[in-house]
Curated annotation (Swiss-Prot):
Annexin repeats lie at residues 11-82, 83-154, 166-238, 242-313. Ca(2+) 2 binds at I255, G259, D299. The lineage of its organism: Eukaryota, Viridiplantae, Streptophyta, Embryophyta, Tracheophyta. Coiled coil: none annotated. It holds the Pfam family Annexin. Monomer and homodimer. It is found in: Cytoplasm, Cytosol; Membrane. PROSITE patterns: ANNEXIN_1, ANNEXIN_2. This is Annexin D1. It comes from the Eukaryota.
Amino acid sequence: MATLKVSDSVPAPSDDAEQLRTAFEGWGTNEDLIISILAHRSAEQRKVIRQAYHETYGEDLLKTLDKELSNDFERAILLWTLEPGERDALLANEATKRWTSSNQVLMEVACTRTSTQLLHARQAYHARYKKSLEEDVAHHTTGDFRKLLVSLVTSYRYEGDEVNMTLAKQEAKLVHEKIKDKHYNDEDVIRILSTRSKAQINATFNRYQDDHGEEILKSLEEGDDDDKFLALLRSTIQCLTRPELYFVDVLRSAINKTGTDEGALTRIVTTRAEIDLKVIGEEYQRRNSIPLEKAITKDTRGDYEKMLVALLGEDDA
């Protein structure tokens, strides 16, 4: 469930564009007005506001926001105002500019989006960067990371609920044998993770637990803690089977470490507010005994804090 609260009475896009223009004029930017508008509009509404702003003022709203705002607040507003496919393309491109730690972002985009959402991200990547996402991922990665990540970002999974229980039994056995032999990079393991539907993967790993007496993630914990590929494999499985638990882990790490990881915090809130941030928040509170909103407000300040709280649906609007 989403946390985004869209206003009951939404003005015309031209009116929103005019109000945003007003927020940029004068001696100082009116950040509260910007939040009151953009943080309470759906992706489609934000898209139309951008179009109206461009038609009326001959400027790209994103460029104006970039010029008027700064720091973490600017990042949150810009990510939020982008269309979801554009946003994922940007996040993925940024990840290909960095090294190992960014592999998780590529995996996250590939595994927590629907097939259609991932396709839109790849199309947006083509349009924005004049090359393919898989091309940049292949260039950015090597070895086992390349095999896994290129397979994941090029995936187009069946989205239905139908599963083949015979296949689940066969592949649970196959995966168990590979894990037992520590062949974590086996092509069949990568094939299963990158081509099977999420329903089929869940059926396979449920059968794995039934047949072998422990969850697959528990089996993978027996590997080398310093093995970065194994860590990415664990995160991949978690994203495909229980994404809310993956996001809780990322949020907890982002908020609880010395010095907040605003990049991860902003990414999760802006990408999940229209999808399942309510479920993530409930799981966060269950596991950490503190509401997500309270954890965030303890570690953030100013307009950045106000924006995140608004996307959590916890402001007064």
